[in-house]
From Swiss-Prot:
SUPFAM superfamilies in alphabetical order: Trimeric LpxA-like enzymes (SSF51161)
Protein name: Dynactin subunit 6
Function description: Part of the dynactin complex that activates the molecular motor dynein for ultra-processive transport along microtubules.
The encoding gene: dnc-6
GO molecular function, one term: dynein complex binding
Organism whose genome encodes this protein: Caenorhabditis elegans
Length: 180
């Protein structure tokens, strides 16, 4: 985090200190931010909803010159994904090395496959999947559901292995009965 950052992290959010957070970023309840994630809000604020997962090396960058970037609830930004979207709704999966270009918009229950791109000023309707090397798209009938078990597991395990913003690292201790 830089000196000019205004970061608000909810008490139940897990944010590893190796994450790079710049500018005005608000991270709400239950989110999990892995090491080496980048939040770059130097050109405009980033507002992150509840229970999102940001995996290693995901880059979330607001390039809008003052307009807020809004990310809804229960999204997964997988490893090395990049987003400069002005809006990402809820229950979306942004795949490994996927790119959401400047100014695009992703509604709810969408899936952007590995190495796929949502282009600038493109707006994905609800329940659209983008797939294949040519960025084909189709409407799906089944909504995306982030597993509450996955996010709960990450909230428990990451503090054991990483330092967190605003929290002390968990330390395993042996009980008195085990020591005897």
């Amino acid at each position: 985090m830089t000196e000019t950052s205004t970061v608000s992290i909810a008490s139940s959010a897990i944010v590893c200190v190796e994450a790079d957070i710049k500018g005005e970023v608000i991270i709400k309840e239950g989110c999990v931010v892995h090491p080496f994630v980048v939040f770059d809000a130097t050109k405009g604020p980033i507002y992150v909803g509840e229970n999102n997962i940001f995996e290693e090396y995901a880059v979330i960058r607001n390039n809008s010159d003052g307009q807020p970037m809004i990310i809804g609830d229960w999204n997964i930004f997988q490893v090395h994904s990049k987003s400069s979207a002005k809006y990402v709704g809820s229950r979306n999966v942004i795949g490994v090395h996927a790119v959401l270009e400047d100014g695009c918009s992703v509604s709810d229950d969408c899936s952007v496959g590995a190495k796929c791109t949502v282009f600038s000023h493109q707006n994905l309707e609800p329940s659209v999947s983008v797939y294949a090397a040519t960025n084909l798209s189709r409407t799906t009938k089944t909504p995306n559901m982030t597993s509450p078990h996955q996010i709960e597991f990450l909230r428990k395990i990451l503090p054991s292995y990483h330092h967190l913003y605003g929290k002390k690292k968990a330390v395993a201790t042996a009980s008195a009965s085990a020591a005897q």
